[in-house]
Amino acid sequence: RHSDPARRGELSVCDSISEWVTAANKKTAVDMSGATVTVLEKVPVSKGQLKQYFYETKCNPMGYMKEGCRGIEKRYWNSQCRTTQSYVRAFTMDSKKKVGWRFIRIDTSCVCTL
């Protein structure tokens, strides 16, 4: 995986997968106030519309995480890989049909919790 010989054999504590997700696949999200909003597929720009994409990272369900975090001593620690979220700007519509830019939560990493 790595071209640097010093880094060969390095593994993450938790396995993750990352992918581009379209607003068509996302449909809804939670905004900063905790409200569920509709994620709009297209964003209006001066020359038409652009599709909305989000780069999401989450824990890999097929990875090592079933037995806890890699490298954590199971006899002494109860560990778990968990997907965490961050806020990103998205073009959305709220329950009152108000359209605009809001911060929504998306999956952004896989971390080890003890």
Curated annotation (Swiss-Prot):
Localization per Swiss-Prot or TrEMBL: Secreted
Heme found in the keyword field: no
One GO term describing the cellular component: axon
Keywords assigned by UniProt, alphabetized: Disulfide bond, Growth factor, Secreted
GO BP: any one term: neuron projection morphogenesis
SMART domains linked to this entry: NGF
GO molecular function: growth factor activity; nerve growth factor receptor binding
Paired cysteines (S-S): C14-C81, C59-C110, C69-C112
Main location: secreted
Primary role: Promotes the survival of neuronal populations that are all located either in the central nervous system or directly connected to it.
Family of the protein in this entry: Belongs to the NGF-beta family.
PANTHER family documented for this protein: BRAIN-DERIVED NEUROTROPHIC FACTOR (PTHR11589:SF3), NERVE GROWTH FACTOR NGF -RELATED (PTHR11589)
Protein name: Neurotrophic factor BDNF precursor form
Lineage: Eukaryota, Metazoa, Chordata, Craniata, Vertebrata
